[in-house]
Amino acid sequence: MNLHEYQAKQLFARYGLPAPVGYACTTPREAEEAASKIGAGPWVVKCQVHAGGRGKAGGVKVVKSKEEIRAFAENWLGKRLVTYQTDANGQPVNQILVEAATDIDKELYLGAVVDRSSRRVVFMASTEGGVEIEKVAEETPHLIHKVALDPLTGPMPYQGRELAFKLGLEGKLVQQFTKIFMGLATIFLERDLALIEINPLVITKQGDLICLDGKLGADGNALFRQPDLREMRDQSQEDPREAQAAQWELNYVALDGNIGCMVNGAGLAMGTMDIVKLHGGEPANFLDVGGGATKERVTEAFKIILSDDNVKAVLVNIFGGIVRCDLIADGIIGAVEEVGVNVPVVVRLEGNNAELGAKKLADSGLNIIAAKSLTDAAQQVVAAVEGK
């Protein structure tokens, strides 16, 4: 779950990290009033969306008058911002962040992720701030400096100083950087984050460090113990199908193809998408119904898949372990009858009571194609899409 920039900076303030004074606004009038609260300009106005590349798309602007602030807010509020990180529809702009402009002397980068290879939280710092860190890692990886946090000791001040020295910082900037490093690490660990990023972390012309931007990604599996973060969730920034799936504890990710996929188990779901592509098809989604594939969840899964107008056929791939395939077949039949599926449905059942499940599907009288194997299922669903 991602947070907006203004929400990230609210967290920074709670942990004593330096950031520009700013206010999130939902109307042009609020934006003008925010400028008055901040004081004399210039100001910076920023569209609040869960995507990078806002500046290049016109979603960030330095302004010198309240009239410019109002014009920016009127232009963007209620509209959609399209960046290189969004799809063609963009993300809705419901808030504008108005904050004091900062005199920038130099831009740095500081961020952290969970590194699965080392199984630790790893901090990354670079002198190449203001640029996508992925681009820096690809083109100039030697400019990224890393430290890993020991899970027993947590972050240590010497690690912050080590990164500061590698960035060429001196004097009070080393102390300021170390404080920011320790604060970010504390936020990361206490708030169960998967990602934290300040890009850019700037050195002002007055010789101080300021968190000019903030990006936070929370671990969705830990939100049950982070109620304040859970309340910050902005579902308008999420794919509505993904949000609906989450309510039913379905793992759904929208893709660009035309073959809907419903599978139990994440690994099997990825394998299913691979074999669909191997036979010339394009998956429309990743959908893992999990071990409790009840009729209700299967019905909801069908509704979510078919809400995508691009879907021309559905492939259901179920491995019956604890779950019996005949019960899954009952759920599929009931779901198809209730939802009114008007596209071909190919079902592959394997495992516990698979033969009985296949017989129920065959006897249902519905437009359900029972596949004999995963390869057969992939071939049949691709053929169905092609009208063969």
Curated annotation (Swiss-Prot):
Gene Ontology molecular functions: ATP binding; magnesium ion binding; succinate-CoA ligase (ADP-forming) activity; succinate-CoA ligase (GDP-forming) activity
Keyword ATP-binding: yes
Superkingdom: Bacteria
Domain ATP-grasp: 9-244
SUPFAM superfamilies from the UniProt entry: Glutathione synthetase ATP-binding domain-like, Succinyl-CoA synthetase domains
Annotated Gene3D superfamilies: ATP-grasp fold, A domain (3.30.1490.20), ATP-grasp fold, B domain (3.30.470.20), Succinyl-CoA synthetase domains (3.40.50.261)
GO biological process: succinyl-CoA metabolic process; tricarboxylic acid cycle
Pathways per UniProt: Carbohydrate metabolism; tricarboxylic acid cycle; succinate from succinyl-CoA (ligase route): step 1/1
Signal peptide positions (record): none
Reactions catalysed, as given in the entry: succinate + ATP + CoA = succinyl-CoA + ADP + phosphate; GTP + succinate + CoA = succinyl-CoA + GDP + phosphate
Residues noted as binding substrate in the record, renumbered to the chain: N264, G321, I322, V323
Positions of ATP binding: K46, G53, R54, G55, E99, T102, E107
Alphabetized UniProt keyword annotations: ATP-binding, Ligase, Magnesium, Metal-binding, Nucleotide-binding, Tricarboxylic acid cycle
Positions annotated to bind Mg(2+): N199, D213
Swiss-Prot/TrEMBL cofactor(s): Mg(2+)
A single cellular component GO annotation: cytosol
EC number assigned by the record: 6.2.1.5
Subunit-structure text: Heterotetramer of two alpha and two beta subunits.
Family: Belongs to the succinate/malate CoA ligase beta subunit family.
Function: Succinyl-CoA synthetase functions in the citric acid cycle (TCA), coupling the hydrolysis of succinyl-CoA to the synthesis of either ATP or GTP and thus represents the only step of substrate-level phosphorylation in the TCA. The beta subunit provides nucleotide specificity of the enzyme and binds the substrate succinate, while the binding sites for coenzyme A and phosphate are found in the alpha subunit.
Protein name listed in UniProt: Succinate--CoA ligase [ADP-forming] subunit beta
Species this protein is from: Salmonella dublin (strain CT_02021853)
Gene that encodes it: sucC
